Amino acid sequence: MAQIESPSLADLFDLDLLEGKITSKLTKARGFVFGANAWAQIRDDIEAVYLSGGPTILERMGFTFGKSLVKTEDRSNTEQAVFFEKLADLFVSAGWGRITLSAGDPTSDQARFSIKNCVFCSEIRGRSRPVCEFMAGVIRGAADELFGGQHKVTEETCAAMKDDSCDFLLERCEPERSFGEALGLF
């Protein structure tokens, strides 16, 4: 079996050291470097300030980011599976960890993703529940935008709980109805 060569940072990002700019070749968006320790502190602070709302805020941030990754890419001639591979390459090169499809099919009702070396919990230990809400949101946002419909993402295992990887279940779900729709007013 032939060895597949991963893209380098230069393949995925333009680094302009004179101007102090990093630009993604995938999304054409400007980016920045953010340390895992700083992320862990910010994540913990958001959870401390907003309590049970903290994880929801983090997931929504990821959701918006995931949708934007898909929206900004010209994929008119790109199959969904190829596009997912491009996103996986971006995650690896950005230092987020290695994401793989471990079971199922994201175009169907259910799929599982596994992330080894997840940056979002790499500096967080001893937790009793998963803490990668941002990454769950990225997966959900990208899936909603790429495959259509609405999805739910559940983090089933997390390195912050001493698991070997962060594993996510992606499920297609029924669209949420408004209060008026639920009452039959619309």
Model features per residue range: what roles?
Residues 1-133, 152, 157-186:
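N-terminal accessory segment detector
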